[in-house]
Structures are given as C-alpha cells and as structure tokens.
UniProtKB/Swiss-Prot annotation:
GO biological process terms on file: fatty acid biosynthetic process; malonyl-CoA biosynthetic process
Pfam families documented for this protein: ACCA
EC number: 2.1.3.15
Domain CoA carboxyltransferase C-terminal stretches: 32-289
Protein name as annotated: Acetyl-coenzyme A carboxylase carboxyl transferase subunit alpha
Species of provenance: Staphylococcus aureus (strain MRSA252)
Amino acid sequence: MLDFEKPLFEIRNKIESLKESQDKNDVDLQEEIDMLEASLERETKKIYTNLKPWDRVQIARLQERPTTLDYIPYIFDSFMELHGDRNFRDDPAMIGGIGFLNGRAVTVIGQQRGKDTKDNIYRNFGMAHPEGYRKALRLMKQAEKFNRPIFTFIDTKGAYPGKAAEERGQSESIATNLIEMASLKVPVIAIVIGEGGSGGALGIGIANKVLMLENSTYSVISPEGAAALLWKDSNLAKIAAETMKITAHDIKQLGIIDDVISEPLGGAHKDIEQQALAIKSAFVEQLDSLESLSRDEIANDRFEKFRNIGSYIE
C-alpha cells in the first residue's frame, strides 16, 4: 500500500469486515456495503486525479507494475526472444526479439525488472550491463538490415554502475547506442513504462516517437539522488520530484516526449490487458504516422527531433 492510498485501505477494510459479518451472522448489510463501495470509487477517483509527482514516482516503482514481458504477449504475436551480444554474454536485464504487430514483423527490445526477489537478482533489478546495451544494438542493426520497425520499452533505474560493468565499458556501450540509434533507417518507437533513469534509459530511447505511461517517470537522476546532491539530504526527495519535472505530463509540456498514454484507475497493474491494448493502439498510430517517410527521412526525423530538444536564453 502506498502512503497516499491509506484512505482507500481503510474503506476496503470496512467493506471486507461488513462482508464477513454478513456471511457469518446471516444478516443483510448489502446497503451499507454498496454505500462504502460507492465511497471507495469516489475517493479513488479523487486521489488518482490529484496525484503529486512523488506519488507517481511511487507508482512507477511498484513491484506489481507490469514489465516488458508482461506487455509483449498482449501487443505482439509470435514473439521469439533472441539472446547474447556476440561479445561477452547474454544480459537478462535487457530482453529483445522478433514478433508481429498486426501482421508486420517488428523488433522488440526492453529492460526487464524481476517479479520477486529471486527474479530481481537474475534480472539485476532491470539495470543492464554493457552487454545488455550491445545486445540491444545488435538487434537494432539486424532490424535495420531487414527493414523491421523497432519498439523499445524503457523501465530502469539506470544502467548498472558496478565495477565489472565499468571495466567492460558501460559508458562506451551507451554512447555507441546513442550514436547508432540516431542514424537507424527504420522507424523507432519508444515507451517509458515505469522508471526511465538517466543514460540507462537513453541507451534504448533515441526514437522517432517517445511515449510515456501516465504514471511513469523520466529523469537524469532519481529524486533521492538529486536531493542528496543539491541539498545534501535524500529525505527531500519529494521536493526534488516536484522541482525536476519528471512526470509524463510535465515532460510532454517540455516537448521531450510525443504523447502520454492514460492508465487504468489505480495504475497499469490494475488491468494489464487494458493497458497493453492502449499501448498497442498508440504503437500502431505512431508507426502509421511514419509510413510516408523514406529510410533517409526516418533517420533525419529522429536526428532533428533530438537536436531540437531543449532551450536556452541569450
């Protein structure tokens, strides 16, 4: 339960208590239950239409929030995962493969968090090593060769900062991806489905179209990290989250992303299928908008998109 959901938790407890009492004592409490359920729905709408940036950070980090592999079966047909970077090893924190979107062959790449403690250790909490980014680039170059559109799912706190990852060229692998992705001659569409953290997110995020789920975040550093750097106190993360403009709607206003995809009331985890279908619809729409461009125009469109991000005052 998240902090801002405590009022909902209390109402749910009352509903469960009344239901138990009704069954146990064979009394009719349905009217009271209906009133509480209506109250729960009103309170849920009230809370989720007035979320603060820190609230959205908490939702983006939920363990039960859908991952890349949760969405793929609903969006793509006949997905086949491909493994390895052909240099060192396969990285389970970065998954990729080939599937079909409405009958068209596409390449799918995404960061993959774990679903429980054991899985998180295997997936390294969604923080890819250099070989993860090199695997992603290998699949992107393959997609370019066979003229397959590329779809990427961003869901990471950041690239793994460990000693071994640095020794194997973490920064170089991400930098190479930025360079190579900028010139790919097939459509690239990216979506942030959870946390989009720093260069780890950008390593698969240089796309013609960048989308975000309503309760996802995209930032150069975590709110805790920013608070520690700016004010020497990570407990000021809530203030940092407000200041950094890391939510989907803020980033859309800044012109960094192209669209925000709404989530079911309560978050994407409340209805994975509904959320996946909304993502699929957005993917199809964005891909259709790029169909009229030549291969060179697709690459130029992406390059100019990122060249034009940002502003300055003379």
